[in-house]
Amino acid sequence: NPTTYTVEDEITLIKPTKRGYNANWDNGGKISKGSIGDKTFNANWTAIVYKISYNLNGGTINGENPTTYTVEDEITLTNTPTKRGYKATWDNGGKIAKGSIGDKTFNANWEAVVYKISYNLNGGAIDGENPTTYTIEDEITLINPTKRGYDFANWDNDGKIAKGSIGDKTFSAMYTPVVYKITY
């Protein structure tokens, strides 16, 4: 942009640029032919509004997170999506740093919650090993324990964890005494 003009000049100033902002000159940034006197132009900066979108990847969200931001904002998402049996994290830790520009999309990333499995063998023992944890994605059938002098009857809770199950589980082994013959 020029730094001087004469009464014969007609000037339209080029808009200044600044990352994350739109600008306009006051007075329209123009000097008309025939103008006289010193001129001062001030740039009027307006932060560009960018869109924020969300991909919940099968989850749901209670509450709202921001849908727009500007270069002046620092955003931390406070509402995390939920999905049965999973915990979520957002891309980028759910943050937009001050000074960022451009539309943003946050994806929900899902990790299966790990639940505990506890056992009460009631004096029995297992030949092998039953799992001590599971997730909503697992399907488990327990190994039955043995107990000297007893037949294994059943596990409470059927000794199975169906795919889609959630929550910590405790299984107790049930036995029936072996009936022995006495011969005389």
Residue ranges and their predicted role:
Residues 1-184:
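Secondary-structure capping and domain/repeat boundary segments
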